[in-house]
Amino acid sequence: MVNFPPEIQCFLQLGENFSLPHINTPILTIEFIKHIECNLRKLSPASRIPIREKLKSIIKNIPSYSFPRNSHNDWLTRLYLTAKNFLQNNKDLILTRADKGNVTVALDKFDYLNKVGDLLRDENTYTIINKDPTKKLISNLKELLSRWKNHGYISNTTYKSLLFTDGILPRAYGLPKIHKINIPFRLIVSSINSPLYSLALFLHKIMIKNFPTASSHINNSFDLVQNLADVHLDDDSLLISLDAISLFTNIPTDLALSSVSSRWSFIRDVCDLPESEFLSAVRFVLNSTFFTFNNIIYKQTFGTPMGSPLSPIIADIVLQDLEEKALNTLRFTPRG
């Protein structure tokens, strides 16, 4: 049991988004460039050049910039250094955020690895892969994009923006559900900078912009209140709420492809890809469910890949189809 000094607790309660005073200019410069380049990837190569030119002078001036000093910044800097030293001396601790709520959680590293490991030991959902599939993924991606470019489906600029030649596999981590008994974990997979991230985002943008939303779609709680304002219920009416458990890992690939294919008419005129090529790319992304945790490579054996930009829209349209089919089987008309 580790006892956290009050000043360490105070510092950690600031949260991960709190802006701390900068004490390491070289690291600040590198991080600044990394964030800029990460966002520039979203633009066309021609658009990146003038932005880089404008940023050159800013980057050059960072080392000579004198950041303001005051008692608050000095106090925060001392707290930061104290907390950093404390964590370096307690390497069995892991800091993360809670699954819900703006809360920083300190975990025992052994317990964290065990609990996340328990999730990954579900043989019906995950399997360990002995050989790194990254090179094969990149090779298959290049083959797909080259075929598209050679047939004139995409431009050379789009080809370059979608091709990842040095990507890494998606990375998994766990977030504690501190609001539940025994504090179970939610498995999260981050696919940013993975080989198929840009392709998945490309497909996602086409679908999200053109697929119609369900008539039952609610944007937020305010929209819900507005929709319910004029609904009058009888005394014997029932209000039900349904929750999907582990949605992404329970959607069959063939069902996902069927839902996309049935909506092809909405994107046919705005997409230069033939339906067969578009569906082939969707299948490629959905079947590439590799990720790493604690230096072990896993493959999700069923469902849509967690962490992929493509999975949310796929889950949405599959649920739309399920909702429509379920409502059509009812012997009465539900209200709402």
Where are the language model's segments positioned?
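Conserved catalytic motifs of the protein kinase core domain
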Residues: 171, 184, 235-237
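Short, solvent-exposed loop/turn segments at secondary-structure junctions
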Residues: 180, 195, 245-247
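Catalytic nucleotidyl-transfer cores of nucleotide-processing enzymes
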Residues: 191, 195, 237
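Short helix/loop capping segments that flank catalytic or ligand/cofactor-binding pockets
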Residues: 104-106, 115-116, 183-186, 197-199, ...
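Non-catalytic, polymerase-adjacent accessory regions of viral genome-replication enzymes
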Residues: 1-172
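Beta-strand-loop-alpha "switch" segments that mediate conformational coupling across diverse proteins
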Residues: 203
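Conserved polymerase palm-domain catalytic core
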Residues: 206, 216-218, 222-226, 230-336
